[in-house]
Amino acid sequence: MYAVLKSFGLKGLNGFPVEVEADISGGMPALSIVGLPDSAVRESGDRVHAALKNLGFKWPDRRITINLAPADVRKTGPVYDLPLLLAVLTASGQLEDVPADAAFLGELALDGTLRPVSGVLPMALAAAENGTHALYV
C-alpha cells in the first residue's frame, strides 16, 4: 500500500517542495525514514507512532518505509510529523480523500495535538509558487 503527500522544507531562508511517500509492505514490523533526514526528522517516527495510537488509529503491524523526496536535500526539524502521520494513515487505508493539491506542515505532540513550527512563511510562499491550493499547518 502506497501514499504520497506534499509538504515543504526550509533550506536557508527559502522553502522547497518535499514529497512524503509512505509504503507499507510485508515483513518484520519496522519503520524506516529515508531521504536525508536529520535527527529531529528520524525522531518523527516515534512521535507519529504515539500520536496515531493516542488519536485512536491503529499502527500498521508491517514494514513502513517513508521517503522524503528529493533525497539529495537534507530535511530538518519536526515539520514533517503531520505529513508522515497522514501518509501512514492513507497508505494503511485508515484515511481517504486527502486533497492532492494540498500540503501539510506540523509538529505533533504525543497525544496528536499540533505544535507550532518555525519557517512557515517561506514554506507558504514556496507552496503558492508551486501551485499548492491549500496549506495545512
Task: Kindly give the residue locations of the regions a language model identified.
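Peripheral, non-AAA+ core regions of ATP-driven protein-machinery
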Residues: M1-V137
